[in-house]
């Protein structure tokens, strides 16, 4: 833990720090006693000094004032080896992390310490992870679309530049792969700076993402300053305190690029549910009474303190894309339900589509966006999206009849609707760049104009004579024709 505070705070020498000692340890929670009149503030960072030089210091964050000159703090790392009576130093500031261009290409933990074995970070700029949201007068309310190159997203639930997007899905439906593809596409198309916050997810996925970024050139190990992303990890094997605060560490780094460098920044958080889950663990350890489904009573407040800082100002923007695990595929669970209120667009991943092998498994009817309005996206985009949704909705309504009576019992119009809906469903699948090594198919970036053209042609009946499998895992509509010709040639040679 760095004891030099950020530019927002006055520097005080170590001799003037308030000192206390541990009186109780309950797992990752410590009770610390201080002298009268020397109590630390809520959210201050405390450092437990190791008794020997080789012992690492443990950083904690003050969560409660207990009275009798005692505070309760949550540790950001393992508390193994700590004992009652050990000395604790109040740093006088919240946890402060390095910010600026020197963070690009590096991997950090919740304390802002590099964990990539590439040496210390060359910067004197530190910033506290607890800050207020920007005032209303500084906010930027302009509306513009953020093209991702993913057909189903750009057409039916477009993302807002400087907005917040949620990727909702249960276990194993493709949230992390979709986030990795978005990082890849956006870095290539826009060349902007990104910050990735790995909150309580698998260490293997964090390693895969790092390797993928090195291969694609998003991280340049020869010239780190030319890298486009900073990575902040608090994985699922870490204490709840680290998982609860790692999202704020990533956000603090993104805020610096927005406020000081005046850049447009992308903030990826995987997974926002783990942030809530860690808060629930900490809340129980602090002795608070749980609320609905066992979540912390402060769920809305904690979510708001993170989400309200993710916004666009007149200096720059933060566009946030957050994966949201949905427990038992229940969207009414308090964790995803609380997240919904803060989002501009929701991309819902469907297990039934994943079971059909349609990837990305984005549910075109459940996914929504406040940007899908004719005055924002234009009449052609809006009308095409509505016609696609109407066709898919009618197909969904007819599925029970098809399951019981079969396709032959439908009217000619309904049979045509079902055929076109199945082609659209498959056309909205897409090979991903980050999944090339698994699928063997090269990834495709499809412009919004091409997506609209393709769906318009399918709906108008231009491809009614082609089999639906030719629409599966292609990029533009022109590739469908090429695929159909290849299949005809194969059948002819047989």
Swiss-Prot record:
GO terms for molecular function: ATP binding; ATP hydrolysis activity; proton-transporting ATP synthase activity, rotational mechanism. Gene3D superfamilies: 2.40.10.170, Bovine Mitochondrial F1-atpase, Atp Synthase Beta Chain, Chain D, domain 3, P-loop containing nucleotide triphosphate hydrolases. InterPro entries: AAA+_ATPase (IPR003593), ATP-synt_VA_C (IPR055190), ATP_synth_F1_bsu (IPR005722), ATPase_a/bsu_AS (IPR020003), ATPase_alpha/beta_chains (IPR050053), ATPase_F1/V1/A1_a/bsu_N (IPR004100), ATPase_F1/V1/A1_a/bsu_N_sf (IPR036121), ATPase_F1/V1/A1_a/bsu_nucl-bd (IPR000194). It is an enzyme of class 7 (translocase). CDD domains: ATP-synt_F1_beta_C, ATP-synt_F1_beta_N, F1-ATPase_beta_CD. ATP binds at residues 169-176. Its EC number is 7.1.2.2. SMART domains: AAA. Keywords: ATP synthesis, ATP-binding, CF(1), Hydrogen ion transport, Ion transport, Membrane, Nucleotide-binding, Plastid, Translocase, Transport. It comes from the Eukaryota. GO terms for biological process: proton motive force-driven mitochondrial ATP synthesis. HAMAP family: ATP_synth_beta_bact. PANTHER family: ATP SYNTHASE (PTHR15184), ATP SYNTHASE SUBUNIT BETA, MITOCHONDRIAL (PTHR15184:SF71). Produces ATP from ADP in the presence of a proton gradient across the membrane. The catalytic sites are hosted primarily by the beta subunits. This is ATP synthase subunit beta, plastid. It comes from Cuscuta sandwichiana (Kauna'oa).
């Amino acid at each position: 833990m760095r004891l030099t505070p950020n530019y927002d705070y006055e520097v005080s020498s170590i001799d003037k720090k308030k000192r206390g000692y541990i009186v109780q340890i309950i797992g990752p929670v410590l009770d610390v006693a201080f002298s009268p009149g020397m109590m630390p503030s809520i959210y201050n960072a405390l450092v437990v000094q190791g008794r020997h030089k080789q012992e690492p210091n443990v950083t904690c964050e003050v969560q409660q004032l207990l009275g009798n000159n005692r505070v309760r703090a949550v540790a950001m790392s393992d508390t193994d080896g700590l004992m009652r009576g050990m000395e604790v130093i109040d740093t006088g500031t919240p946890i402060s992390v390095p910010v600026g261009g020197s963070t690009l290409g590096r991997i950090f933990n919740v304390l802002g310490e590099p964990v990539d074995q590439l040496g210390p970070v060359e910067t004197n700029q530190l910033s506290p992870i607890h800050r207020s949201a920007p005032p209303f007068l500084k906010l930027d309310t302009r509306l513009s679309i953020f093209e991702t190159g993913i057909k189903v997203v750009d057409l039916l639930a477009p993302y807002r530049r400087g907005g917040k997007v949620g990727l909702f899905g249960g276990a194993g439906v493709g949230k992390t792969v979709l986030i990795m593809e978005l990082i890849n596409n956006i870095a290539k198309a826009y060349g902007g700076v990104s910050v990735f916050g790995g909150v309580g997810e698998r260490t293997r996925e964090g390693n895969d993402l790092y390797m993928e970024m090195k291969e694609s050139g998003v991280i340049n190990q020869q010239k780190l300053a030319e890298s486009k992303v900073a990575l902040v990890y608090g994985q699922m094997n870490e204490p709840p305190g680290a998982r609860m605060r790692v999202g704020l560490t990533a956000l603090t780094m993104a805020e610096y690029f927005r406020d000081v460098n005046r850049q447009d920044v992308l903030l990826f958080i995987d997974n926002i549910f783990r942030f809530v889950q860690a808060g629930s663990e900490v809340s129980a350890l602090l002795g608070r009474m749980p609320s609905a489904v066992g979540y912390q009573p402060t769920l809305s407040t904690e979510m708001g303190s993170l989400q309200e800082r993710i916004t666009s100002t007149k200096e720059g923007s933060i566009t946030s894309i957050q994966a949201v695990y949905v427990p038992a595929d229940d969207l009414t669970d308090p964790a995803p339900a609380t997240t919904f209120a803060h989002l501009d667009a929701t991309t819902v991943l469907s297990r039934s589509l994943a079971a059909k092998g349609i990837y990305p498994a984005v549910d075109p009817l459940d996914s929504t966006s406040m940007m899908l309005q004719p005055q924002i996206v234009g009449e052609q985009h809006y009308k095409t999206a509505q016609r696609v949704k109407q066709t898919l909705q009618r197909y969904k309504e007819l599925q029970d009849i098809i399951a019981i009576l079969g396709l032959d019992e439908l009217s000619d119009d309904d049979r045509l609707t079902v055929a076109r809906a199945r082609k659209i469903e498959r056309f909205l699948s897409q090979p991903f760049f980050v999944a090339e090594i698994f699928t063997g198919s090269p990834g495709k970036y499809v412009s919004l104009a091409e997506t609209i053209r393709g769906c318009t042609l399918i709906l108008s009946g231009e491809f009614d004579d082609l089999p639906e499998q030719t629409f599966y895992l292609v990029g533009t509509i022109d590739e469908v024709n090429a695929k159909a010709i290849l299949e005809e040639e194969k059948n002819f040679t047989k």
